[in-house]
Amino acid sequence: MSATTWSASFGGIAGSDLEAELAQARTVDHDANEAADLEHAEATHHHARVAAQGHARGDAQPPAGALARDDGRRAADYSVQLRGVGKRYGEREVLSGFDLSIERGSFVAIVGRSGCGKSTLLRLVAGLEKATSGVLEKRNEEGGPLDTRIMFQDARLLPWKSVLQNVMLGLGRSAREDARAVLAEVGLLERANDWPAQLSGGQRQRVALARALVHRPQLLLLDEPLGALDALTRIEMHALIERLWREHRFTALLVTHDVHEAVALGDRILLIEEGRIALDQPVPLARPRARASAGFAALEEHVLQRVLKTAPNDDALSDGAYDARDEGRARRPTDVRWAV
């Protein structure tokens, strides 16, 4: 896949203390929220002042709520939009009339049964295949092409090249320091000169992640990248992916069979059934996610029931019946079904 390569400038974060880094990220997010609130207040004051001046001059006033609607339009910043997208393979229709908007900088997780169209959707967004019908748009903040990278379940490292050389694939010698910096970010700088065969499965996936991030992508697509890893390594990779996403603020689109993984990483969970979105569930849980909390278990159960179609009321679930206020309420062990 052809994509513009950006010059990367990474900090020397080795990932040794993920909890401390995530705590720092929460502080940064809080400061950013306060700044956004201040900016909104100033904008509101400006609109009020302009309206008062116009009223004094006898100018026509806009309808009530027009300014709010205009602010809403400006606030909706999408990096990916699909409108009426369809995909067929011969007589088989995989996606039909598919509509989806992904906000810039968000982390969207896609779940569903095998064959529902999850990976097909990802390949369309990646540009590896073309839609049969509809419109698919990807754009950066300036309206130009969106630099996109994809990470698969198989790390796809070249066995005859070193770890560092694999990260530098497609880049010139000038990218050597950038590659070393991103290897430091995934905690593998000391393995830069090793061969892929000398690495564990989790380490190979870290190299694949570094190879994607060295290009400073604006959109990172993850096609079940952790499916072959053991449970502990998956949790470590969840923390790593979340940390790098928070630091670099790329848009992430994850396809997974694991509902637990979707709740752990996503801002939003989409369930695809028969080529359409059957559930669009926000994840109202603080980061980093407390996996042992009642709220986490309740949301996981909510999505899992909908995937399995065993919920007592599917319509209520699809309408977003999960309530974050239930997080602190007591739950009996029999209320929760665990996916094992």
Curated annotation (Swiss-Prot):
Tell me how this protein sits in the membrane: Peripheral membrane protein
What range(s) does the ABC transporter domain occupy?
80-299
PROSITE patterns linked: ABC_TRANSPORTER_1, ABC_TRANSPORTER_2, SSUB
UniProtKB keywords:
ATP-binding, Cell inner membrane, Cell membrane, Membrane, Nucleotide-binding, Translocase, Transport
Which residue ranges does the record annotate as region Disordered? 44-72
What's the Enzyme Commission number for this chain? Answer: 7.6.2.14
What is the protein's major site of localization?
A: membrane
Annotated transmembrane regions: none
Task: Give compartment(s).
Answer: Cell inner membrane
- Provide an example Pfam family for this protein: ABC_tran
Q: Which GO terms describe its molecular function?
A: ATP binding; ATP hydrolysis activity
Protein family: Belongs to the ABC transporter superfamily. Aliphatic sulfonates importer (TC 3.A.1.17.2) family.
Q: What is this protein called?
A: Aliphatic sulfonates import ATP-binding protein SsuB 1
The species is Paraburkholderia xenovorans (strain LB400)
